[in-house]
Amino acid sequence: MKRRISIILIAMISLIISSNLSVMAYELPHAFWGLDAGYSNATSSKNYDETINYGVQIINLISSEPKNEQTINILGSRTYDVAFAYFMNGDYTNAAKYFEMYIPYGKQLGWTDGVIIAENCVKQFTNTFDVYQATEQSQKVYGAKNEPNGVLYGQVADKAKSNESMTLLYLEYGDESTFGWTRAMLDKAETQNKAVEIALNFPQEGTTVRNINGSDSFLSDLRSMLSTYKNVPIYLRIGAEFNVWGDKCTPDEFISAFKAVANSVSGLSNVATVWSMAHTSSWKTNDWPYTADDFYPGDEYVDWVGVNCYASKYFQGRVWQGESRYNEVCFKTGYSSDPVVMIKDAVEKYGGRKPIMISECGSAYRTNGDINETDSEWAAKYLKQIYTFIPMVYPQVKLIAYFNAKMNYEVNYYNLDGDSKLQNAYNDVTESPWFIQNNNTNSAGQFFKKAGSTITMNGDTTLYAYPHIYGSDWVNVEYYLDGELVKSTLK
């Protein structure tokens, strides 16, 4: 099941550095001091226009000066503040420009939090527009275990539909009481020729990890059960979302546990191991200074890499005002819910050598708490993006599983059967030809290839577009042939 995640919020960092540092044999230009006085007044009063005005002048002035501790501090703080001022003013293009300018200074100065914020803002604020062309050939083949020819899709086992090509079920490590139900679901999958993603959760998270040694009866009994389903492609997802656990563990502890589970099913030709992360990690701290990548067990133990993809209109069920809005950017909610950007790091890091699955996904139609809002249109829009843009942009992704369950204690509800517009959006988009229908051994009827500056075709062709424009509720794409408008996405 989807877990409640605890994420450490950070207070808004202040990067305003005193300009009165003493540096031997160097004096700041005389013009700096007047500009700095105006800049200080602007930042203290949160006058973003004047922060930009004075900040840009200071950046231009100091950029031509020798690089030393003082000038680097000035450039680091001013580029960050100018970027944030553009962010607050809604000028995301210039915000991205100055955040990108800030990053090398922030790294040099050890301003880790600022660098994380800046890198996320650059990813979100940079506009992207790519065109794709329909093709009959897969654009990425790994030769991996249980690799399909297209994109498998499905949902939790108790809601599965006959036309879906995979199903998702859950086991809790150490608990064999559900093995009977698991066998029943595997029997059903075998009869219907569905692939199965088994989410082997670690119920006590880090505590469970520390108690796994590979010699307990649970693992031997699990292997025995899975070995009887040789005709069912099984994706064993081991200890998922480790990077947002409340009861944390170290990378060494997790890797040891993962290897123990992976070794227990090695040699089973139908079982592929899956290492699966949450799309965004808990914030780094002195006590937990890790990224998801630190927990990777190694290629020899991992057949597939998974990542979750949950679209939520509000981060932690609240509205973030003013400068605290960076939380929405860093934790990928609201306008930052673009699924392509959400999983970008995972695909780019591992998709060159491992097939990728969206091991769980959902689009929130309901936000509880102080928000108390239902927005079916928003949820349907982002569900369609998950199921269209991800297969379009990332041929590395070969499985998408929807978490069709309602967790009453969660801030957000994602269940398809809780909202008719969301359910209809799922039904419609999963009929698309890039999904494998019914039997998991079938092939998709269509794939995507990225179009170049010139499109060559013999007869008809189908074009698709992926636009990413931060802060836009809707984007209209127009297609022209020989200067004539032939199609608009709004018509």
What function would you assign to each model-found segment?
Residues 262-291, 350-367, 397-405:
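Aromatic-lined carbohydrate-recognition surfaces of secreted/lumenal glycan-active proteins
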Residues 446-491:
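Long, low-complexity serine/threonine/glycine- and acidic-rich segments characteristic of extracellular
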Residues 114, 128-155, 234-235, 354-446:
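Substrate-binding cleft of secreted/luminal carbohydrate-active enzymes
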Residues 175-279:
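Substrate-binding cleft of extracellular glycoside hydrolase catalytic domains
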Residues 182-197, 201, 310-368:
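Glycoside hydrolase catalytic-domain groove-lining segments
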Residues 28-36, 117-181:
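Boundary/entry segment of secreted carbohydrate-active catalytic domains
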